[in-house]
Amino acid sequence: MIKMSDFLKDCFQKIGWEKDHVSFGDLPLFLKAMAYRFPFENRAVLAKENYKITKEELWRRLLKDQHGGLCYDLNGFLYFVLREAGFHVKLIRGTVYAGDQEGWALEGTHAAVWLSAENGDYLVDIGFGINLALQPIPLSGETVQSPVGSFRIKKEETEKGSYVLLMDKGEGWQIGYAFTLEESDLGDLDNMKDIIHSHEKSPFNKSLLASKLTPSGRMVMSERHFTIYENGGNIQKSDIGPSGFEEKLNTHFL
C-alpha cells in the first residue's frame, strides 16, 4: 500500500473520508463523498479567473479556497486524487450531447477519467452536473444505478468518439456524451477551460449556476432561483436576489 501523501490527507479530510486509503471496492462510497462535497459551479468563468490547471492549483482551489468547479476542475482533481491513491487512470475528453434539438455541444469540452482495474476498464466522472452514476461505469456495457437514474456505456462510432455514455433518468435512454479513450493532458484541460470561458456557444459563460447531489436528493441554483429536490419527490423552490447566489452557495453548496 502506498504511503498517504499530504495531498491525499487534505482531500480525505475535506470530504470526511476516514480511511487512509481507497480500494476499488471503496470507489462508490468515495465518489459519493466527492460529489457531495464539491459543487458543479461556474463563478470562475463569470469572473474571468485566469488560472492554469495543475495539481497544485486544483489543491488550492478545491481544498483550501471555497471553490467547486466545472468538469475540468472536478475531474482534473479526481484524476490526481485517484492517481495518488494508486489507481491506473488517465484523463479523457468527450463531447456532450445537448439533446435532439441542439445536437452536439462544443467539441471536446467535457473532461472525464478512464480507470483500469484488474476486472476491467471504467469511466469515472464527478463533473457532469448532477448526472452522476456515483460509481465506476464499466466500459463493457453493464448498467449501473444511482439515485439520478441508470447509466451504461455503449461502444458506438459517432462523429465525436467511439463510445457513448447513456443515461436513463426515467424517460428512456439518452446520450449524455460521446468520448474516446485517447489520453488527454493538462494542456488539453486548459484549452477546454479557455473555450468554456470565451466561446459564444459556451453554456457556462452567460449566467451563474450551481448544482450538487446530496444524500437526500439534489440542489440546483441559478441567478434567480434556488431549488432543493428531495428523493421522495418534495421540491422546495425559492427566489433569490442579486446578492443571494453567493450567500446560498456558501451556506448550502460549499
Swiss-Prot record:
The keyword Acyltransferase applies. The keyword Acyltransferase applies. GO terms for molecular function: acetyltransferase activity. Keywords: Acyltransferase, Transferase. Its EC number is 2.3.1.-. It comes from the Bacteria. This is Uncharacterized acetyltransferase YvcN.
